[in-house]
A protein has these predicted regions:
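Non-catalytic, usually N-terminal nucleic-acid engagement modules in DNA/RNA processing proteins
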Residues: 1-75
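Extended two-metal-dependent nuclease catalytic cores across DNA- and RNA-processing enzymes
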Residues: 21-24, 78-198
């Protein structure tokens, strides 16, 4: 088994910011993010065909901005602005588009996509499977396994880098100076300005 877990929330915001506004002519509904999201999802599935192609796939979404972390620490991500008004009606449409691809769309109240991705990744690894996490989220790098049973794929284009960049234990070490299992300790010591964690 080779499980592909896509950080759907990340894909939504990338698609939203990458494309100009687009609305449906019949009713003016914003759909630019949905168009970009589906194009990205289609490209991903096409790019990963071959001998090492995933046998299973799911797209994981944040349920909402509120999670068990905000209950424990109210300042968690408190500095982030709310989602743009024209993006909000596109959230359910991206889930529907995912299901239209016949791909499971998974989210759970009070949990972030990262939590669900980590749970599924560890369960698949423990069952002897291989896991690819499609995300550029540094928080997920702690899941990368030196034996390659869990690795990441960053599909965000960056100058001077390939369009699809694999992240294994070596890349995690290059970024943090520690092995993946120590990333959580580095973040605990350094905090995380992105998530407003001191």
């Amino acid at each position: 088994m080779h499980l592909l877990l896509v950080d759907g929330s990340s894909y939504i915001f990338r698609a939203y910011h990458a494309l100009p506004p687009l609305t449906r002519k019949t009713d003016g509904l914003p759909v630019g993010c949905v168009a970009g999201f589906t194009n990205m999802l289609w490209k991903l599935t096409e790019d990963l065909k071959g001998d090492d192609a995933p046998t299973h796939m799911a797209v994981i979404f944040d349920y909402s901005a509120k999670s068990y972390r905000t209950e424990l620490y109210p300042q968690y991500k408190a500095h982030r602005p709310p989602a743009p008004e024209d993006l909000v009606p596109q959230f359910p449409l991206t889930r529907a588009a995912t299901r239209a691809f016949n791909i499971p769309s998974i989210e759970m109240e009070m949990y972030e996509a990262d939590d669900i991705i980590a749970t599924y990744a560890c369960m698949a690894r423990d069952a002897g499977g291989k896991v690819t996490i499609v995300s550029s989220d540094k928080d997920l790098m702690q899941l990368v396994e030196p034996d390659g049973s869990i690795r990441m794929l960053d599909t965000i284009p960056r100058a001077g880098q390939p369009a699809m960049r694999w992240i294994g234990a070596e890349e995690v070490f290059a970024k943090f100076g520690v092995t993946p299992d120590k990333v959580i300790e580095v973040q605990a010591l350094c905090g995380d300005a992105v998530d407003n964690v001191p």
